[in-house]
Amino acid sequence: WDLECKIKNTSIWKLMGVTKPTTLPGSYTVVLDEPEKMIEDVSNHLEFPTLKLKVNKNDLHQILTKTRELSPNKVLIVDANEAFNIDDLKSNADLFVKTKIDLIEQPLLSENDNELKGLNFPISLCADESFHDSSDLAKMAHKYNTINIKLDKTGGLSEALKIVKEAKKLDLNIMLGCMVSSSLSMLPLLPLYEYADFIDLDGPCFIANDRKNGLIYENGMMLVKEDLCWG
């Protein structure tokens, strides 16, 4: 895609027929730590519209309750990274509802996610480790409400574009996600922003030196400049 843009002397936005945004809502990930340190991290990043909390089954009540108190109007995502079993998930349902969690990412081990089939859970569940590319889509529809698309898993924008179109037919919501990596790994997902229900592209926030002309995060927003290093 980037090469075609250069050959045709155009932008990825024009090539794909997508309106280029000037800003997109940013997300910040609070990594798993002692509850007090996690809550301090939350309090230091309240400018972000979305906060994602990496958790396991320990100290959930303290972490979620205090985070919601500090951020009453934020989108809150809980990322269990496969740390729950099905009983953990069910037993904390009331807590998730009370603290108005918007999304729970990969609650169970991917090998155990058949246990989610037919579960009428009150919070949207998102597949991450369970989902890699379009060949997994049919398996997701009866277990999850949302899929996390990462270029590190799909292999590139072409496959990601195929995924979002097929996912919408299956009534699956879309999260645009990332690993800890530079802006070069985020930028090819940006043209899909109109499909996204959640945008979680904070990878460059966790590296010392990002690519030149990469994403800029300002007041919790991603600034989409004209002279980006891709597209």
Task: Report each predicted region and the residues it spans.
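Conserved, mostly hydrophobic/aromatic
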Residues: 9, 79, 104, 140, ...
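Catalytic cores of alpha/beta
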Residues: 86-96, 133-144, 155, 163-164, ...
